Structures are given as structure tokens and as C-alpha cells.
Amino acid sequence: MVYTVFTNPGDRMMALAIPNGGHISTGRKEFSGTAGAVHGLEVEYFPFDRKEMNIDVDKTKQKIAKMVTEEKNAPKLAMFGGSLFLFPHPVKELVETIHSAGAKIAYDAAHVAGLIAGGRFQDPLREGADAVSLSTHKTLFGPQGGAVISFENYGEQIKKATFPSNTSNHHLHSLAGKAIAFAEMLEFGKEYAGQIIENAKALGQALHERGLTVLAEHKGFTESHQVAVDITKYALGGDMEKALESANVIVNRQLLPGDIQAGRHYTNPGGIRIGTSEITRIGMKRSHMSEVAEFIKRVIINKDEPRKVKEDVAAFRKGFQKVHYCFESAKDAYEYIKIR
């Protein structure tokens, strides 16, 4: 929908490269990315600071200036956000440069929508984004789905891009569940989002103390729900994703900056990505992250038999059988006056 509203086929857009945290939906045609292959956009990558694990503001300003003045082909859209999203992106630092070039700003909040709703991440619309796309089923813990939000000046365009341009129907059966999830975010979101980030930082520290190379140590590892780990000293991400799953520990293999240059492929990259939203929702706190880190270490570093680790994970998990940050009963949900 964002592409339909803000661009035409053949336009230029800026986004993160996938090894730098970008999502396939913003990828180039030659990599089967949605932006290039489906909408026909020419994708230019944001310059990226690998040490800071974020967009390089100064180099981005220089790149946009060159696109405008020398190449005479300014971007029409700048897409912030991604699938590896450790720190808030520099929207407010780049909004003037991007808008001055005649481009619109979109922000992919699929992974961090719950943190934004909880007031613990950046506020992209108020920092200058023209539209925000999001998932309703990640850190925002509702049924699977998505949404695009914006201020009123783009509202009608987004509605028309949604129907009839891109969709003909939506899943009505999920709306009630989403409404309850949104109400729970209003009631519990601040505490929930804060605990997620606290747990992620603690998990990063615990993994670091056990010898794993956790990215962005000098910045406290993360300001989101995600922790990124370079495991090339011991194994590769695709192999360990499978091994950890066999041990009942679910992580994602993750392309990291430098993987492509090193000849690694997205099916077996150099990293893993770990999120803390699910374990937070079942009641885990900062103090439990050392045990979670130990399970991961046993598989990756110690090369313990996943079956044995699985038994220990199951025993540990028995202590967390309740969903937190939610209404205790249907009555609580239906009587929640803030959504009336």
C-alpha cells in the first residue's frame, strides 16, 4: 500500500540492504525483493555504520545530495525500519534532507510496533514519517495481520490503495482478537515493552559473558526486543537455527553486515537473531536471561546433544505457564472502558 501511495514503477527508493537489517519487501528485483520485483522500484541502499548498527546519517545526506544534484534522479521514497532492528532509526535527523529532495518517508514498524505502542521506542510519525506500516502479530501481540497508519493528509490515499488497489477483502474473524490485543496494549503496553527491552539487554549481556559475539556491545547490545549474535567463531546461522530448534529454543538465522562479502548465503549466514517478546509475555524477567543464554551456549559452543538440552528447556519452561500483560478474563476485556 505504501508503494502504491507514494511511488510509481521506475521510481527510486531508499532502504536498508538485507545484510544490514533490511527486509525482503524492500529489496531489489535481482534479489526477488517486493519493491523491485513487484512494484518495479529502483532500490538504493542507505549507507550503514556497522559499528553503530544503524543508518549513517552524514553519508546518507551526502548520497541524497548526489542523487539530486549530480544524477538528477532523486528518490521518491525513503523506507526506514527492517527485520533486524536493534536501535531506533534516524528519522528526525534525516527528515529535512529527505523531504527537501521531494521524497516521502515511510517506516516499517512490523517488528517494533508493540514497543512503539508501549512508548518505549521512537515515535516515527511525530518524528516526520508520512506513513507507518506494521504487523499486528509480533511485539504487537494480536492475530496475524497488518496495518498502515498515517496522519489525515494521506488517509484517503491509503484507503484507496488498500481497496480496491491491493486487496479485495480482509479477515473479519480476526478483528475482535485484534481489538482485544490493542486494548491490552493500552492497558499493559508500557510495562510490557519496558520488560521486553530490559530482558533483551540482559540476554545480550548474558550471551556476551558466555563467549558469544553479541553485536553492539558498546551500546548495551540493543534498545529493542532483538539481540544479534555473530556465531561464525563456532558455527553458521542456518545450522544453529535447526540445532537450537531441536533443543526447543527458537531463533532466526540472520544475515549480518559483511556476510555477503565473506561468501555466506542467507540460508546459512553468520548470525542469529533472538527476540524476547514471547518469553517476556509468559513471565520471564531479567533474572531468567542467564538460563536462556546458557541453553543457547550449550548448543552453539559446547555442542551438547540438542535432545538433552531440550529436556532441560522443557523443565525450565514448566515454570512459565501463564500469559502476562493481558486481561485475566473475557469480562475484563468487554468491560474495558477505554475502548468504548
What are these regions (language model features)?
Residues N169-L172, G189-Q195, L207-K219, L255, ...:
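Flexible, glycine/charged-enriched surface loops at secondary-structure junctions
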Residues M1-R210, I231, T276, M284:
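Conserved PLP-enzyme active-site core in the AAT-like
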Residues E198, G263-R340:
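PLP-dependent enzyme catalytic core of the Aspartate aminotransferase-like
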Residues A161, M240-K242, L255-P257, H288-M289, ...:
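Composition- and surface-driven signal marking solvent-exposed, interaction-prone regions
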Residues A247-V251, I300:
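A common structural junction motif
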Residues F182, A193, I197-K242, V251-N268:
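Conserved small-domain helix->loop->beta segment predominantly found in fold-type I
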